[in-house]
Amino acid sequence: MNIVYHEKGKVFHLFNDTVSYILMVLPHGGLGSLYFGAALRDREGFEHLFERAHRGMTACVFADSRDYSLDAIRQELPTYGSSDFRRPALNVLQENGSRILDLQFKDWRVEDGKPKLAGLPATYVESPSEAKTLIITLEDAPTGLCVELLYTIFAEGNAIARSMRCHNAGMEMLHLQKVMSLSIDLPDTDYEWLELTGAWARERHVERRALATGITAIGSRRGHSSGQYNPFVALVRPETTEMQGEVLAVSLVYSGNFEMLAEVDNHGVTRLQAGIHSTDFDWTLATGETFQTPEAVLVWSDEGLNGMSRTYHRLYQRRLARGTWRDKVRPILINNWEATYFDFTEEKLLAIADVAAQCGVELFVLDDGWFGARTSDHAGLGDWTVNPDRLPNGIDGLAEKIEARGMKFGIWVELEMVNEDSDLYRAHPDWVLSVPGRRKSLGRSQCVLDFSRQDVVDNIYEQMAAILASGKVSYVKWDMNRSITECWSHALPAARQGEVFHRYILGLYDLYERLTTAFPHVLFESCASGGNRFDPGMLYYAPQAWTSDNSDAVERQKIQYGTSMCYPLSSMGSHVSVVPNHQVNRVTPLHTRANTAYFGTFGYELDLGKLSAEEIAEVKDEIAFMKEYREIFQFGTFYRLQSPFEHNVMAWMCVSGDQKTAIVGWYRTLNRVNDRFARVRLAGLLPDTLYEDSRSGARCYGDELMHYGLITTDGTTGEPHPEDGLTTDFDSRLYVLNAVE
C-alpha cells in the first residue's frame, strides 16, 4: 500500500497489491481522472493517460489551446459553468448570484490511517498501518472556498474511500447547492448499470441494463435511503457474471436523501457520481465554517459480482460495523409481532417465551405496543414509558421473568416518530416537521419528529436512556415507519430550510452515537418498515438490520440475494414466520423457511405454542443446527451461485475461514416433472481437499465440486415414484460439506 506523487507530471498514484487509483493536476489547476482498476506498477509518466482533443462547438479554458475544453476532459471535481456542460459535482451559489468556480490545486498531504468524518458514519481503521489517506486541497480565490478531497486506500482489498470537505475561508456567505461525495470520469462506456430496486416488502431486487448516451440515475428524496433504491450501484461489463468479469461499484455511507448517476457523454466517457441529493438541499456556509460530505466507497473487481461483494462484506463487517457485537455471533431470537400484533398481555408473552426457551431460543423481543397509550398504531409514539395496563410489572419485571427462563430480553422502539395522540405532541406540537398553515401528511397515523433540533434529540435520548439504564434490555429494534413530508423546521429561518433533510440525518446519527456509546452491551437492529433504510450509514451504529417486513421464504430469497450484493450476512435480520405467510399468504415448508433464514442472523416470528409436536421437534433441530454453524453463516465467505431472478432454482453458499467446511443452500420455487439432471458449481473450496457431503455421505474433491459441480438431481428427474421421495413446490435442501481429515 502506498501513495506516490510524481512531481514531473503532477500525478498521484494510490496502489496496493490489487488495485490502483491514478489522478493528476491538470494544466488549468483542477484535477483529472486517469485510472481506477487492477494494480499497476508505479512509474513516472502516467500523464500519457491524460487525453484531449479539439471538439467543435465548444468553449476552451485557454485562448491558445483549442484542444482544452473541460467538456472533453476527464475530471475528479467538475464544477458548473466553465466549459464543462456535463453534471457538476460541486455547485456553490455566491452572494453576487454566480455559481462559477475555478478551483485551483493548492497543496496535498498524506496521512497514515484514516481520519474520522465529523458527525458522520464512515469506514475506519484500528491501526494507522491499515490505510493511507491522500488529502488534496483546492482553492477558489475569488470566494475563498477551500475544498479538500479525501482518498483512502486500504492495505488489503480493492476499495477506495472518498469524501469531500468544503471550508469557507472567505468573507462572503456561500450556499452549497450540490456537494457530491464522489465524481469520477471513466474512459469508456462499455458498461451495464446494476441497481438494487423495489418497494416495501420487495426491497433490493437486482436490475441490470445497458448504459446509453444520456443519464442513468437513482436516488431518494424520502428523507431516508429507501427501499425504492439502495445507495449502491455497480457498473459491470456486459460479459460479467457472478464468478468472472470486471465490476466497478460505489456504495454511499449515508442514510438520507441521495443520488447516484452515470452520465454517458457523446464522446465515450462515463461520469459516475454519488452523494447527497441536490434537490431540496441548500446549505449555508458562513465564514469559517466547514461542511463534510458523506463517504463513498468505490470497489473494483475482476472476479465478477461475487468478488465485488466479498470486498464490501469484509470491509463493512470489520471496518464499518463497530462495538461489542461486531465480531460476535448473533443471538437466536423470537419476536412476538406476527404472533400477537397489538393483542398481548404479559401472560400471553410469557406463554410464547416458555415454548421458545424449551426450543433453545436465546433472546425474546417485545415488539410494538408496550409504551404510552399504545393499543393500536393511532396513539402513544413519543411517550417512551411503560403502559402499566399491558405490563403491570414494567419492562424490568418482564425482563426478569424472561431471564429466569434462560433468555435475554429486547424491545421495539420508533424514536423518530410521534402520534398526535401523545403527551409529547400535546406538549410540543412544534417539534414535528410541518409547515405552518398547511396540512400535515400522516403515515401510519404518525408525524416525524424534527431531529434537526438538538432539544428534540436530547428529549428522546433522555427517555430512551431511562429505559436502558437498568441493564435489563439487551437488544433494541429501532424502527422508522414513514417517509418525511412537509420538511420544514420551526427552529430554522427561511434561508436555512434547505438544510433540514441533512440536519435530520445528523441528528439521527447523534442519537445513535450517544445511545450506543452509553449502552455498549445492547445489540441494536435498525429497521424502517423492514428494509427501507438498509444502508451502510445504519451499519455503523447497528450491526444488523431488519431486511424486509416480508418474511415469506420465497420472497426473502430474492430480497436477501440482492441485499448480499453489498451487505454481509451478519447484517441481515432473517426470521422463520408462520404459514400462511402474513404478507403473501403463501404456504412454504418449515424447513425451507429455516433454510432461507439461516443465511442471516436467524430467528422466529410466530407463536411456537401453536405448532405441532412434530414441528416443535423440527424447530429444536433448526436451532441446534444454527448454533453449530452460525459462525460460518454470519462470518464465513459468502458466494451467490444461481440467481432467483434468472432461474427456477436458486443456490448460495458459505465457506468457513479455513475452507474446510461449506454450507450450500439449494432452493426450487416450483416443482417440475421429468426434469433435467441437475448440478450446482460451488466456489471457495480447497481444490485438493476431499469433502464429504453430510446428506449422502458422498465424497468429492474441491476441484470436482467447483468445476463439475455438486449433483442436486432428485425425484423430479424422470417419472416420479413415491420410493424416490416426492418433492413439492418451494422445496429446499442444505448440503454441509466437511473436509475429510
Predicted regions and their residues:
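Polysaccharide-binding surfaces and accessory modules of carbohydrate-active proteins
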Residues: 3-5, 9-13, 17, 31-263, ...
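Glycine-rich, aromatic-flanked loop segments that form ligand/cofactor-binding clefts
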Residues: 72-74, 79-117, 242-261, 299-324, ...
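C-terminal beta-strand-rich structural cap/linker in extracellular carbohydrate-active enzymes
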Residues: 703-741
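Conserved, mostly hydrophobic/aromatic
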Residues: 18, 164, 288, 334, ...
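Aromatic-lined carbohydrate-binding/catalytic grooves of carbohydrate-active enzymes
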Residues: 325-462, 475
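Active-site neighborhood of glycoside hydrolase catalytic domains
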Residues: 392-394, 426-428, 432-589, 601, ...
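Carbohydrate-binding surface patches
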Residues: 242, 644-687
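Short Pro-Gly-centered flexible turn/kink motifs
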Residues: 98-105, 283-302, 730-737
